[in-house]
Amino acid sequence: MGKLVIGSRGSELALWQANYIKERLKKECFIESEIQIVKTTGDKILDAPLNKIGGKGLFTKELEELLLKGTIDLAVHSLKDVPVVFEKGLDLACITKRADVRDTFLSTKFPDLMSLPKGAKVGTTSLRRSMQLKCKRKDLDTESLRGNVQTRLKKLESGEFDAIILAEAGLCRLNIQGAKYRKAFSVEEMIPSMGQGALGVEMLKSHKHFTALQKLNDEESAFCCHLEREFIKGLNGGCQIPVGVHASLMGEKVKIQAILGLPNGEEVIAKEKQGDKNKAFDSVQELLEAFLQSGAREILEKVQLF
């Protein structure tokens, strides 16, 4: 039997993730595989903010097209980049155990967010992060920061930015110290993106190895990530909207925290819901309803103007 082909983006972090799945496939599923690098729309267009490029699946669409053609057998994604609605015939075969879900502040000069001078320039790719930064510091100048992790760090070190915000999971996976000052925000300080810290493996549901990859699935992480994805789906949102959502389990209880707002931090809804694990999806719907009643759809319409 030939090797399975893993589709992956070409960045160092994406290849770390693909190799992580490759090793686990061999060790736990006894399946040999090889990696094929694929350039996505998000990789090709680096001179514009992600929300200006338009469309959903900026980092997944080309990989999904190759899955549907049968050119690759599976695609490894950062789960936060995976659209909540799949192309017909595709689905997640597994969601891996979550790494650190937090966002991290990095600076060469300033120890934390509150020590930044007035009007400081902060780099981030994410409207979600911009919105939450502006909630804390309206004066900050949040600017688009594109490129891989190393490119972003070089922009910080060259003085282009006073600080940047990156995902802690990516820094840990690449074993990067980052900068002189590095401080992770708590989930309460900055609510992460849906699925942040987890990897999603996408395949054709009809693929003969689809079920076998369930061995790589982490039940608790998958449960929480599906709750988060359900919330985003209810907003009819994609990966580039200013929404943070995080679900966590505490024994037989679940807590879901969410925030949505304009990128300038002017109109923001923040709520949380706690409930029984066995009624967790009902809790998501109740939280979603509370957001919609508070004007979530109207805010998302205004986001298009930014």
Swiss-Prot record:
Pfam families: Porphobil_deam, Porphobil_deamC. One of its GO terms (molecular function) is hydroxymethylbilane synthase activity. It is an enzyme of class 2 (transferase). Pathway: Porphyrin-containing compound metabolism; protoporphyrin-IX biosynthesis; coproporphyrinogen-III from 5-aminolevulinate: step 2/4. It catalyses: 4 porphobilinogen + H2O = hydroxymethylbilane + 4 NH4(+). The modification S-(dipyrrolylmethanemethyl)cysteine is found at residue 239. This is Porphobilinogen deaminase.
